[in-house]
């Protein structure tokens, strides 16, 4: 199931959450240990929607039963490559879970640092951490959460994030005459 694309959000906020343990000694020395998990939170805001625009969005949200159901969302603007890449990007060789350098081919143009990508065999979305022009090594973070096989398709335009509602309580406000304001908080499903 896909989140409605119309109307578009007035604003989108994407947050990266890493699972780390952090301790600080009395002398001020800090130790940090990564638990290896990373996921994104997405906050979308709508301002001044007419009832005819708002009703289908809120009906979709209600159908998710709070945080029970999973669905996909393609955030506007940031879900597509900013470097003008074309073609079908694929893995060139297999890669194991934890790898953050992925050999790729099958496309031309540029994938830029900050672009999002998704591998065809699982739902996790990754961020590119260094520009890559055509075949070569794609640097991503976090490291792969699942192994990928040779020739696995990598989506870099209209990247779908698999999410659920972060909160079980959803509320909206009505301002002026028939103008709805609504904010939705989503969390990436791992």
Q: Where are each of the predicted segments found?
A:
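Extracellular/virion structural assembly segments
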Residues: 1-190
């Amino acid at each position: 199931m896909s989140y409605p694309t119309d109307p578009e959000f007035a604003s989108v906020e994407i947050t990266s959450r890493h699972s780390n343990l952090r301790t600080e000694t009395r002398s001020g020395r800090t130790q940090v240990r990564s638990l290896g998990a990373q996921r994104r939170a997405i906050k979308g805001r709508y301002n001044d929607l007419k009832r005819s625009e708002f009703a289908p969005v809120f009906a979709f949200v209600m159908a998710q039963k709070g945080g029970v159901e999973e669905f996909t969302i393609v955030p506007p603007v940031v879900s597509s490559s900013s470097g003008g890449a074309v073609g079908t990007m694929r893995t060139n060789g297999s890669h194991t879970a934890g790898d953050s350098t992925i050999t790729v081919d099958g496309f031309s143009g540029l994938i830029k640092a900050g672009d999002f990508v998704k591998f065809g065999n699982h739902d996790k979305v990754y961020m590119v951490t260094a520009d890559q022009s055509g075949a070569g090594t794609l640097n991503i973070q976090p490291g792969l959460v699942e192994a990928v096989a040779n020739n696995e398709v990598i989506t870099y335009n209209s990247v779908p994030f698999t999410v659920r509602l972060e909160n079980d309580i959803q509320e909206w406000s009505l301002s002026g005459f028939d103008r709805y304001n609504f904010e939705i908080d989503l969390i990436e499903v791992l």
